UniProtKB/Swiss-Prot annotation:
Its main location: cytoplasm. PANTHER family: D-AMINOACYL-TRNA DEACYLASE 1, D-TYROSYL-TRNA TYR DEACYLASE. It is an enzyme of class 3 (hydrolase). It comes from Shewanella baltica (strain OS195). It holds the Pfam family Tyr_Deacylase. A Gly-cisPro motif from one monomer fits into the active site of the other monomer to allow specific chiral rejection of L-amino acids. Homodimer. Keywords: Cytoplasm, Hydrolase, RNA-binding, tRNA-binding. This is D-aminoacyl-tRNA deacylase. An aminoacyl-tRNA editing enzyme that deacylates mischarged D-aminoacyl-tRNAs. Also deacylates mischarged glycyl-tRNA(Ala), protecting cells against glycine mischarging by AlaRS. Acts via tRNA-based rather than protein-based catalysis; rejects L-amino acids rather than detecting D-amino acids in the active site. By recycling D-aminoacyl-tRNA to D-amino acids and free tRNA molecules, this enzyme counteracts the toxicity associated with the formation of D-aminoacyl-tRNA entities in vivo and helps enforce protein L-homochirality. It is found in: Cytoplasm. It comes from the Bacteria.
Amino acid sequence: MIALIQRVSRASVVVDNQTIGAIDKGLLVLLGVEQEDTREKMEKLATKVMSYRVFSDENGKMNLNLEQVGGSLLVVSQFTLAADTGRGLRPSFSGAGTPDQALALYEEFVAFCRAKGVTTETGQFGADMQVSLVNDGPVTFNLQV
């Protein structure tokens, strides 16, 4: 399972010209599910995302996590993160999870974060989405479990 996280001052996702999810300070999480992913991996990754210290403390050091800064999550499914780009000029998605598997783990990821008390907005699984963000830093990390 892959989470590309970006520290943002704001982010939103639009489907069919309607904003369906938006946050201010927090993390935009682009979430990719791979074939071998499980609920255990999802919980490990969600915990890491929520606990990852990517926000600056009073000394300007990345030392604070999402909860410590009162931040939110915007979680957007993105199967292209599971692409194999090692050969040729076209990505292969053979390692990506099936749509049913990916939807289940995406929904469980969101529910897990919400159950931990984190304000969590979402995109729409499988939809054509327009994602807007102001990357704060820029700060972007690729987390995998």
